[in-house]
Amino acid sequence: MIRVLLLAVVLALALAAGAWALFMHSADHGHPITVGALEDAVKLPDPKLADERVALASRAGFDALNITTLWAPGQTQPDPGELRILRSVANATQSHNLQLLITVYAARPRYAPTTDTQQDTYAAFMATLARDLPTVDGFAIWNEPNLNTFWLYQYDAAGKDIAAPAYTSLLARTYDALRAVSPKIKVYGGNLAPRGFEDPDSPRPTHSPTQFIRDMGAAYRASGRTKPIMDVFALHPYQTRSAIPPGQPHTGTSLGVGDYDKLVALLGAAFDGTGQPGSKLPIAYTEFGVQSVIPESELGSYTNVDSPLGKDAVPEKTQAEYYEQAFELAACQPNVIAVYIFHLFDEADLNRWQSGPYYADAKPKASLAAIDSAAKKARDGKLADCG
């Protein structure tokens, strides 16, 4: 009997220790997340060169890439030359064991598909792309539809939101088309800019992500649909300046990494109780960037060196710290599955973005080692302190 009791005690202690270890892992370190980059500079027709570029993503600690391709009205299949490039990237990401996400939008905001015919054409294009690229893990439907930079018609003459309902309809059609190709494909919806405002009379009409989510929910409920329209909600949680820490929250209608609770509440109010998950919907931060100061020794690879936008930058050490903070926050946010930084490589024009761990000529920055370490720990669920 004593032996039995001792065995029971030992077993109970072992189980308790295991449970405590699991608790500590969850409470202290968060959950594993995907860490990647949005980077079109890997889109090269030469498979060898594409592979070399993709390998640099692995070197930075990333396990995913997001690339973009363009759709045009009437197009139901990709251009053959573009398809060769996409296949080159898909093969390279597969060989390096990286996930691949493809974002598809149009070159001009007036091309945004708002009619039934246009949306059916876009959905057919996406289905063809998925069949042609069977190793792609997910597809992001459009880019920042809450901005007229990418989705021109935001309001009707009466000042009513017409962008969110049209986008919700596009999501539904494309979701069905992609899932008919493979139920394993992940459909990323939203893909929203972090800021906007409700002013139909503005010369640049936009919507805040807060209002856009609300209007998506209203459109979904009004449609009577009982199936989902997305598997993942994507947000681009840039701060207004690179010097602002990623976790700083917003009091208004903007959304960032520090506004997780507000985002989950919005998604819940929009979709809970319908066929589309809301408060439990996986979330991905698919664009987030922190620009770093370019040293004088590297300026030879850049243009527009006097650009004021190029001055919105922080030291490389701070860039690494802010990326690590973003990974930590995401790992402590239960619904968040991924963070993608923008870019892997700097853009050479200082009037644009210098937010990668590599300079424009693909040389590593001083921030690379710290970003690599943080990314790998985040992927393993060993980075954050969520206590």
Language-model region placement:
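Boundary/entry segment of secreted carbohydrate-active catalytic domains
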Residues: 21-64, 68-70
